[in-house]
Amino acid sequence: MAHSKEIPSFRWTQSLRRELGMFTEPTKSSVLNDAKLIADSLDFTQVSQVQRLLRKSKRGDTDLDKLRDLNKEVDRLMSMKSVQNNTVLKVGDLGKDELMDLASDLEKLKKKIGDRESNSPRMYMGNLTQSQLEKRAGILRTLGFQQQRGAAGGVVRLWDVSDPSKLNNQFGSMPALTIACMTVQGGETMNNVVQALTSLGLLYTVKYPNLDDLEKLTLEHDCLQIITKDESALNISGYNFSLSAAVKAGASLIDGGNMLETIKVTPNNFSSIVKAALNVKRREGMFIDERPGNRNPYENLLYKLCLSGEGWPYIGSRSQILGRSWDNTSVDLNARPVTGPRAPEKNGQNIRLSNLSEMQEAIVKEAMRKLDSSDTIWMDIEGPPTDPVELAVFQPSSGNYVHCFRKPHDEKGFKNGSRHSHGILLKDLEDAQPGLLSYVIGLLPQGSVITVQGADDIKKLFDIHGRKDLKLVDVRLTGEQSRIFEQEVWEKFGHLCRAHNGVIVPKKKNKEANSTKEPHCALLDCIMFQSVLDGHLPDTIPIQLLPNTLVFQAKSAFVM
């Protein structure tokens, strides 16, 4: 029986490529145009917030609204998208046997995907016997992998939302978005990202790239460090840097490779594509495996094709499509709906100006006078003491804080710190007010005691600024202790800082440790450390003492 055979997954992929090659188009230029527009126009503070909520173990309606709003903005910026075009296939489009075959496969696919989404996240079973599955589980335990456990009934509800249908079509990765995020959040040039992903795409023409391949390619393409080594769970992939998202992006950059990812569906060719897919299915003995697990190549193709009758089924934006494949493609009815318009927009950029004026100095002095030297004052920095890029001074009793930034001199060292620690992107410091950080340090109350987590860097910073009068109290929390309230602080106070939009990549020597993926923000770290000492989040509302128009310089409308 065909269903008892091991699925030759890559052979199926190659067969589908050969059969459907006539329906592919060069996509590199369009993907890069969309990627550039997303990189220039999207608010990456919102991207960081969505990436943060996707890391939560449980997400609700508010989280889903944020994801959907961001997906809507991405869809607006993209020219490569799928549009709602519910398709009805009838005799004449396909033969009667083909229509029955298609209807049967869509029904099986509906059952498979429905079963997977109603149960806990699972691994792809393939066609393993029970004894093989048990042996695999033992191997994974030996290697240190933890099995995901559900509640009493074995159900893990990653999304606890009032209307589950709103989850539909919100999670597929898109090459243009992947490239834009790797460029902006990784602090890379788009050319470097494209070259790295092209290497992955070329490898994908002969095999499925795996983590070993990724590690070797990373030696040549440093920007691939951003790709996560973790296995993606169900319904979190949209903005995650998974290997599968990177491979898909690479495939879209390989013009002339007959990649399935570059198929374009139109109302005129839809039935022909489905007919060709059914032909190769019969020839190769492909089938819908109804057991829960990841989709095999045929299942993946069928689902994507039948979701929308027009657009780019693999690589386009489809977040605005309503319904599922079995809702949007049907058999023996007689209707063809209309398609919607598409209209990307363009944006401009800006420049920055001068140093502190007398009026600005007066504003900073007035702000610093509001700090009570007799009460606890926290301070934290990001970047080395010889080249700091962020400084925060926070007084828990009043909630008053001063938060400022500085453009680094050592851009190479900064990039390393961004990738492994603070996640600040150089472009977000272009307009930081020069001289402000040092001026704030000079105005700290004479002889005051500053509370810190790790005193060495702050002491060196004070020495450089001639502030030997200031005393330090180091709370000396362990790394794990200091991060106890990390998720809650980012959830409640993350809106206070919009500068940490990069992706954090754990250092190689820390890979085995449970290292955080949240960026280190000087201000939020101060709040976090005080929360550990208090055992709860602050009761006071944080108040920024400096206006944002002083922390960052005014931007010119255009360049002469």
From Swiss-Prot:
**Function according to Swiss-Prot or TrEMBL:** Encapsidates the genome, protecting it from nucleases. The encapsidated genomic RNA is termed the nucleocapsid (NC). Serves as template for viral transcription and replication. The increased presence of protein N in host cell does not seem to trigger the switch from transcription to replication as observed in other negative strain RNA viruses.
| Location of this chain's protein in the cell | Virion; Host cytoplasm
Q: What is known of its domains?
A: The N-terminal region is important for the cap-binding activity while the C-terminal region contains the 3'-5' exoribonuclease activity. A CCHE zinc binding site is present in the C-terminal region and may thus contribute to the substrate binding and/or the specificity of the exonuclease activity.
Instruction: Provide the GO biological process annotations.
Output: negative stranded viral RNA replication; RNA-templated viral transcription; symbiont-mediated suppression of host cytoplasmic pattern recognition receptor signaling pathway via inhibition of IKBKE activity
Segments for region (Binding site for the cap structure m7GTP): 54-236
> Which organism does this sequence originate in?
Guanarito mammarenavirus (isolate Human/Venezuela/NH-95551/1990)
Q: Does the keyword GTP-binding apply?
A: no
Binding of Mn(2+) occurs at D380, E382, D525
Listed GO cellular component terms? helical viral capsid; host cell cytoplasm; ribonucleoprotein complex; viral nucleocapsid
Query: Lineage, please?
Result: Viruses, Riboviria, Orthornavirae, Negarnaviricota, Polyploviricotina
Record-level Gene Ontology MF annotations: hydrolase activity; metal ion binding; RNA binding
Look at the named UniProt entry and state the broad enzyme category this protein falls under. hydrolase
Q: How does it assemble?
A: Homomultimerizes to form the nucleocapsid. Binds to viral genomic RNA. Interacts with glycoprotein G2. Interacts with protein Z; this interaction probably directs the encapsidated genome to budding sites. Interacts with protein L; this interaction does not interfere with Z-L interaction. Interacts with host IKBKE (via Protein kinase domain); the interaction inhibits IKBKE kinase activity.
Q: Which gene encodes it?
A: N
Q: Which family does it belong to?
A: Belongs to the arenaviridae nucleocapsid protein family.
Gene3D superfamilies with a match to the protein in the record: Arenaviral nucleoprotein, C-terminal domain (3.30.420.410), Arenavirus nucleocapsid protein, head domain (1.10.150.550)
**A Pfam family in this protein?**
Arena_ncap_C
EC number, UniProt record: 3.1.13.-
Q: Which UniProt keywords apply?
A: Capsid protein, Helical capsid protein, Host cytoplasm, Host-virus interaction, Hydrolase, Inhibition of host IKBKE by virus, Inhibition of host innate immune response by virus, Inhibition of host RLR pathway by virus, Interferon antiviral system evasion, Manganese, Metal-binding, Ribonucleoprotein, RNA-binding, Viral immunoevasion, Viral nucleoprotein, Virion, Zinc
**Quick one: which residues bind Zn(2+)?**
E390, C497, H500, C521
For the site labelled Important for exonuclease activity, the residues are: D457
User: What is the name listed in the Swiss-Prot or TrEMBL entry for this protein?
Assistant: Nucleoprotein
